[in-house]
Amino acid sequence: MSKAVGIDLGTTYSCVAHFANDRVEIIANDQGNRTTPSYVAFTDTERLIGDAAKNQAAMNPHNTVFDAKRLIGRKFDDPEVTNDAKHYPFKVIDKGGKPVVQVEYKGETKTFTPEEISSMILTKMKETAENFLGTEVKDAVVTVPAYFNDSQRQATKDAGTIAGLNVLRIINEPTAAAIAYGLDKKSQKEHNVLIFDLGGGTFDVSLLSIDEGVFEVKATAGDTHLGGEDFDSRLVNFLAEEFKRKNKKDLTTNQRSLRRLRTAAERAKRTLSSSAQTSIEIDSLFEGIDFYTSITRARFEELCADLFRSTLEPVEKVLADSKLDKSQIDEIVLVGGSTRIPKVQKLVSDFFNGKEPNRSINPDEAVAYGAAVQAAILTGDQSSTTQDLLLLDVAPLSLGIETAGGIMTKLIPRNSTIPTKKSEVFSTYADNQPGVLIQVFEGERTRTKDNNLLGKFELSGIPPAPRGVPQIEVTFDIDANGILNVSAVEKGTGKSNKITITNDKGRLSKEDIDKMVAEAEKFKAEDEQEAQRVQAKNQLESYAFTLKNSVSENNFKEKVGEEDARKLEAAAQDAINWLDASQAASTEEYKERQKELEGVANPIMSKFYGAAGGAPGAGPVPGAGAGPTGAPDNGPTVEEVD
């Protein structure tokens, strides 16, 4: 199987895909998003790429670089560059006739070429693919707009090289989109395909003629400064005016308020592609004032009406340039996230007298999709001759259950391809526990309280037994439609129960998912500390209970003596009482108590085992940290469900 990938290096967002087993997979990044912002940020301590960079842009505008694609392969005195540079919050300076960005990084002033910035984004896409494929990725097909000239193409290729990629080929974005739809295989005779690509920052229309698998770009047109961000701006201006009308205050003077408003506007715009109305709620947006309002799809369409209409001019231009009538267009392909907007789809369809455009592949993923197919062909993946490609879905967030101490134990990790099935064995937390509550959560955080509860059910009728003895097998099964079945079986009695969770019930929207995963990144360090703390607590608790149980074993007192037995029992009980009273103690405190308890227990237990003849010494004792046989304390094998 080839490890070559296709990368759509976009102005505002980038996307990576891989072709294997007769299908293309769009690879989600570490935030669970299938597209990654083309942003790089520099701070006093680190460099951020993608979502992390875009999320902090409001706080760090001068050192957050975007739109590198508008600068790459151009001269500093290019009017396009001069014009763009005026509007950027970061500095663009002239270095030997080339534009470079100047930022503060780790306390020093540094300059980076557009190639370097693009290479950082490509590196991020490469790592995203490597994390998913579990192996190094070297070969890639990278896409560029059809109007890119030779120096822009070469500079893009250089960016790939800097990122450690072997760029197999630079292909045109419209060509990639046509390949994604298998249009090169659709008919034997020459046919004309119009690609309408409305992205985040740019708008490109291309007319391709495809003849026996050979693509020829007949004409291109477009607007390098029209895209989703312009629609966001219209919405932002409208909302800022409304805020001013309601509160007699102008929030446009505050960069952070504007950035928050823009984020909300982008989210509202996305929602309006599928709903007729959406609400915007921003707490303390400006000078402590909360901003709540709602906006309808009709109002949004009216705000952007002239922009939407202007998309048809380039369509007319490519038809004129290629001397074709609109009736001669065989296929229309919609590409770019902004073509999800219903009004845009309708305008295109109406222009072509009701002809329906191709849009079965996500428009923001179609280019990477086609690039991945091309990469597979170039690396000799024979199966790619079959065009029956499927778009595989993945589980966007990890799924698991709550175990002792409110910990999220993941059964299905994020980005697992669905359908999938996974089972794990758990046990009880208390002696003679009659039942367990299975609570199903989705999310990336260590503690279930920070994740999203999908559903819960009780498995009762467990026969009385000491803690850690009953074996409860929990199975997660997601089908191709994303419907989750969770079942639990007590292996001794065969008692079972299950729950079915469908997509819409209690599941998160894409926005929520993005938010949660972004939070998970931010809190990762805290999460790790918390996990260690709970582990130390569970370990101590388990150790204390096991010691206490040992004392009650029938021959224990004879072997170690009445006094030692009492001493051990008291120490164990003391630790249990302390634990009950100190649920929020630190990792160090738990470890300290564990040491103290071991100090009392080890000599006594050695005496007991010495008398019993040869023993495992004072290794960890079965319980929270171990299976029925006692396992190293590097993590649970049998966990407990409260």
From Swiss-Prot:
Q: Name one GO cellular component term.
A: cytosol
According to the UniProt record, list the residues that bear Phosphoserine. S552
Where in or outside the cell?
Cytoplasm
UniProt xrefs under PROSITE patterns: HSP70_1, HSP70_2, HSP70_3
Under the heading InterPro entries, the entry gives: ATPase_NBD, Heat_shock_70_CS, HSP70_C_sf, HSP70_peptide-bd_sf, Hsp_70_fam
Induction remarks: HSP SSA4 expression is restricted to conditions of stress.
Q: What is its main location?
A: cytoplasm
Q: Where is this region: Disordered?
A: 608-642
A biological process from GO: protein folding
Task: Write out the entry's keywords from A to Z.
Answer: ATP-binding, Cytoplasm, Nucleotide-binding, Phosphoprotein, Stress response
Which Pfam families did the record assign?
Answer: HSP70
Query: Gly residues bias: where?
Result: 611-628
The entry lists its GO molecular-function terms as: ATP binding; ATP hydrolysis activity; ATP-dependent protein folding chaperone; heat shock protein binding; protein folding chaperone; unfolded protein binding
Q: Which family does it belong to?
A: Belongs to the heat shock protein 70 family.
Cite any additional comment in the entry.
Present with 17900 molecules/cell in log phase SD medium.
User: This protein is called what?
Assistant: Heat shock protein SSA4
- State the species of origin: Saccharomyces cerevisiae (strain ATCC 204508 / S288c) (Baker's yeast)
User: Which lineage do the record's taxonomy fields give for this organism?
Assistant: Eukaryota, Fungi, Dikarya, Ascomycota, Saccharomycotina
Task: Report which gene this protein is encoded by.
Answer: SSA4
